[in-house]
């Protein structure tokens, strides 16, 4: 599974973290 973190430091594997959040890193 792929963990993505937003620019605010919140991490998750859903599209909310991986796609809809700007400035996220995989």
Curated annotation (Swiss-Prot):
Pfam families, per database record: Chitin_bind_1
Applied biotechnology uses: Has potential use as a flocculating agent in water treatment processes.
The keyword Nucleus belongs to this UniProt entry's keyword annotation: no
GO molecular function terms listed in the Swiss-Prot or TrEMBL record: chitin binding
Tissue distribution: Seeds (at protein level).
InterPro entries given in the database record: Chitin-bd_1, Endochitinase-like_sf
Keywords: Antimicrobial, Chitin-binding, Disulfide bond, Fungicide
Residues annotated as domain Chitin-binding type-1: 1-26
Electron transport in keyword set: no
Gene Ontology BP term (one): killing of cells of another organism
Cysteine pairs bridged by disulfides in the record: 4-18
Top-level taxonomic group: Eukaryota
Reported function: Chitin-binding protein which functions in defense against chitin-containing fungal pathogens.
Name by which UniProt lists this protein: Morintide mO4
Natural source organism: Moringa oleifera
């Amino acid at each position: 599974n792929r963990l993505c973190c937003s620019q605010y430091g919140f991490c998750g594997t859903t599209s909310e973290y991986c796609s809809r959040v700007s400035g996220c890193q995989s």
